[in-house]
Amino acid sequence: MPRGAPFICLDLETGEEIWSIKLRGVHWGGYPIIGASTIAMFNAYDNRIYAIGKGPSSTTVDAPMTGVSVGSQIILRGTVTDISAGTQGEEQLARFPHGVPAVSDESMSAWMEYIYTQKPKPTSVTGVTVELFILDSNNNYRSIGVTTTDETGFYSLNWTPDISGRYTVYAKFAGTNSYWPSQATTAFIAEEAEVQPQPTESPQSTVEQYFWVAVAAIIAVIVVCFVITILLLRKKE
């Protein structure tokens, strides 16, 4: 391990490692300084100055715009990304054109090395937690579920609208030790599901009714004639 590396943050009371990153400081590059909860230091590995601190985040949320029915599932989805100043570098924009995904505190050290120091991508990255709320057409505000982003920053949640009308959806990322909170809003309309009419038998036409009456009458006449014929034959005997 070279002198001045890695850069480690320890708990002052317990000595436990909070985080570490493979940056190297040198005497001629100056000592790290801290102000406004941000550490600034020179990294001799790439001759850049790094600022280490809690960064801003950006949350998005989308809902279906059409075809939403009461009682049918929909998917609410979005992203949570890191929008720190460093993510706007040419290298980062080229590698992450859709934004740098936000990750959990536990994944932060290896993730930052991957983003900024050309280290291999971590194999076990965990995302951040997002909670979704809705304001329905009755002005009832309620939580509808909690989900977690993946390594691309994407999240989704299945939910079933229970009343008709307009819904406003709020996706809230509460923040972590590494990121400030952020939230996003969208809306959709749920309509009552269409009731499919039950098939009914079409009523008989007047012609059909007269036809069957005539048939019945003819049958009755034939039966009567047959009975009379039998009686006459017996009388002759």
What are these regions (language model features)?
Residues 163-182:
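Enriched for extracellular/lumenal, surface-exposed ectodomains of secreted and cell-surface proteins
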